[in-house]
Amino acid sequence: MTAVSLSDGTGVLKTDPWLEPFSGALRERYAAYQKQRTIIEEHEGGLAEFSKGYKSMGFQVDKNGGVRYREWAPNATEARLIGEFNNWSHTANPMTKSPFGVWECYVPPVSPGVCPIPHDSMVKISMTIPGGESIDRIPTWITRVTQDLNISPVYDGRFWNPPKDQQYRFKHGHSTRPVEGLKIYEAHVGISSPNMRVTTYKEFEVDVLPKIKQLGYNCIQMMAIMEHAYYASFGYQVTNFFAASSRFGTPEELKSLVDKAHELGLTVLLDVVHSHASKNILDGINMYDGSDHLYFHEGGRGRHDQWDSRLFNYGHHEVLRFLLSNLRFWMDIYMFDGFRFDGVTSMMYKHHGIGSGFSGGYHEYFGDSVDLEAMVYLMLANAMLHENYPHVVTIAEDVSGMPTLCRPVAEGGVGFDYRLSMAIPDMWIKLLKEYTDDQWEMGHIVHNLTNRRHLEKSVAYAESHDQALVGDKTLAFWLMDKEMYDFMSDLSPLTPIIDRGLALHKMIRFIVHTLGGEAYLNFEGNEFGHPEWMDFPREGNGNSFAHARRQFNLVDDKLLRYKYLYEFDVAMNWLEDKYKWLNSPQAYVSLKHEGDKVIVFERAGLLFIFNFHPTQSFTDYRVGVDTAGEYKVILTSDETRFGGHNRIDMGGRYFTTPMEWNGRKNWLQVYSPSRTVLVLGL
């Protein structure tokens, strides 16, 4: 047996002895992390200092009003700062180059305290590259870029330095709520209203934040904040890593939004894209200094065939500075509380997960197919964040099931707090597309909801933005389809399709919430069964906003049945707030009955009885429960306020009998109506 050590990366063997055959790979990974960390300690004064690159690179205004500008561009032979401030002069502000390839210039104040570059004016760096060609680029550390589609789709870099009276002053610090028990509301500012246009930061703050709070979520995951030239990329083709998207408003307005969220007690996560970058040259960081390999790998290794984007060289010192400082920037300047890391599977493997089914065999997670440099970057990122921000939350989007992903770096893990349970939404879509209700296997559903790694927390969700994208559709639309157009009014008949859709939509969300993980996620609009799908304005749809919005008005119209799904979301989130099942050990499942289509489990002192049978209700249905006593109804999806049929007596009492049943010490008998969940508690 390998001796378990906390200092060589094999500490994870304590929680998973099956990793024993791969202890060599774990040691190698941890040694690579320690080596990179040692280099940073020796040359940069430590990881904390190294990750503050945003304080020295890009534009820095000194106390006298002068501006120092630094840019890493080793391939350039000459460089100069140009902009509206110097009438785009190529001679007024030349830059000098350090031995490490960093260009620098200082623009003195006009007079003491008066900045020479006007606030929000346009700026660029102009470089001469080998061969004599002159190229213009937007500074990589720029904090604001804007787009005027009447002139060009290419972004303009802007020098953001508002006067003191226009700078937003935070009233609240980072969230200090525990990392556990997250109920995450995944949101995209631009689509966050029923209007056929881009919604603003201010509108989101005023109109949407109170909804999120009322719904009972305690965390927001904000998509598409990092600037992206192509709106239809959903924010995943980032061009400017330090710029908050100007489509939605100004940097100060985003700060105000985050501050208001903190006032409401919400944790705010940024959907960070460090897995790849837009291949845009004129307004991105591709071919920045004329070379193919500045921030990225050269040639094929630096390109993602499916995403048509560039791939970072995580082994390069300056790339590490750029990415680690990017995380620190969003934490410090905008007060985000953590990150959902996009595309982690693509980062961790040289094959980027393409063509790999991932059977779960441990050999798939170690060896030549793993990108060790990317793994080290993720370990450095998590170490830096958790060492400097005690309440930070990091979530990995990984489909592969990488062991140790959510164990601390000190043990030899990768250091994330959570992973997304990406197999769960896939299961629901497959069931709804390919199987009739009486073909659903209860054992299959339970397995998918509980098949997660011991002591590695996961975020469960029935659907996210991925399922809503064009080509797919929301769960509600899979369930009810075109009948949603004609029969979602209380004044219209309750058709069998709508009745089934409302019932299953509640049950699917609730069983995922209660059985599926240690955190729960919902994509905005799905809490009330948003119809159709997501599709951003683009050439292929006549630049239409029809599907790039969230129709909250459907809930506000009290004649429509969407209110029932919304109210159930409120009830289940606030019930979790009271009983805290997300922060409890995994549920004990005592029954998966294929014939009856019934699932029974206990978690956080509650007894959950799900009857998925399309037609069969059961009288005096016997279920096992461990704790004896008098049980009462805590919640049922069949209540009238949730669009149910009111078949359960809310004042009913259920007494246990001290006799073993389904592996539990006691049993009680209930009435279990079809397509209904019943929650009992002492």
Curated annotation (Swiss-Prot):
Pathway(s) annotated for this protein in UniProt: Glycan biosynthesis; glycogen biosynthesis
Binding site for (1,4-alpha-D-glucosyl)n: 88, 124
Broad enzyme group: transferase
Pfam families assigned: Alpha-amylase, Alpha-amylase_C, CBM_48
UniProt superkingdom: Eukaryota
Catalytic activity: Transfers a segment of a (1->4)-alpha-D-glucan chain to a primary hydroxy group in a similar glucan chain
Site (Transition state stabilizer): 466
Cellular component terms per the entry's GO annotation: cytoplasm
Deletion phenotype: Disrupts production of intracellular glycogen.
Record localization: Cytoplasm
GO terms, biological process: glycogen biosynthetic process
Listed InterPro entries: A-amylase/branching_C, Branching_enzy, Glyco_hydro_13_cat_dom, Glyco_hydro_13_N, Glyco_hydro_b, Glycoside_hydrolase_SF, Ig-like_fold, Ig_E-set
EC number(s) stated in the UniProt entry for this protein: 2.4.1.18
Active site: 342, 397
Keywords linked to the UniProt accession: Cytoplasm, Glycogen biosynthesis, Glycosyltransferase, Transferase
Function: Glycogen-branching enzyme participates in the glycogen biosynthetic process along with glycogenin and glycogen synthase. Generates alpha-1,6-glucosidic branches from alpha-1,4-linked glucose chains, to increase solubility of the glycogen polymer.
Similarity comment: Belongs to the glycosyl hydrolase 13 family. GlgB subfamily.
Protein name, as recorded: 1,4-alpha-glucan-branching enzyme
